[in-house]
């Protein structure tokens, strides 16, 4: 039993180290693409601003209408409140990962006590 617990701890340590180091290397390798660098505004000889392809003024009216119709729906998503009885508390408590750790710890304690008594 102790051998299995030791191997499990080694696995957790190795896994957490691999996740930690892979996150560090991924974050350091990310570079800002040249397309997304801030651009200086361009002006023509008449003093009018030259529109870029991604400017909101340059987007066709059909596409602008689509985004305007979607924005109220997106804003209302956060405002919708579900009733408290939508999901029973027993299901919520089973889905909580903190309770999984507590339950596993309690089961391990019971197992160790049973081994010591037996």
Swiss-Prot record:
Record field: compositional bias (Basic and acidic residues): 35-65
Main location: secreted
Keyword Secreted included in the entry's annotation: yes
Keyword vocabulary terms for this entry: Host cell membrane, Host membrane, Membrane, Secreted, Signal, Virulence
Protein's UniProt keywords contain Signal: yes
Motif range (RxLR-dEER): 49-64
Entry's Gene Ontology cellular component terms: extracellular region; host cell plasma membrane; membrane
Domain of life: Eukaryota
Subcellular location: Secreted; Host cell membrane
Leader sequence residues: 1-18
Region ranges (Disordered): 35-66
Function, as annotated: Secreted effector that completely suppresses the host cell death induced by cell death-inducing proteins.
Homology family: Belongs to the RxLR effector family.
Domain notes: The RxLR-dEER motif acts to carry the protein into the host cell cytoplasm through binding to cell surface phosphatidylinositol-3-phosphate.
Protein name in the entry: Secreted RxLR effector protein 143
């Amino acid at each position: 039993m102790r051998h299995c617990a030791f191997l499990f701890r080694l696995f957790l340590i190795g896994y957490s180290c691999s996740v930690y180091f892979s996150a560090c290397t991924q974050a350091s390798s990310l570079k800002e693409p040249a397309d997304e660098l801030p651009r200086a505004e361009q002006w023509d000889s008449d003093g009018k601003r030259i529109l870029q392809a991604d400017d909101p003024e340059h987007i066709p009216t059909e596409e602008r209408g689509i985004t305007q119709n979607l924005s109220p729906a997106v804003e209302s998503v956060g405002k919708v409140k579900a009733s408290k009885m939508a999901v029973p508390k027993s299901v919520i408590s089973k889905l909580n990962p903190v309770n999984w750790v507590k339950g596993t710890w309690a089961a391990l304690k019971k197992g160790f006590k049973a081994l010591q008594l037996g």
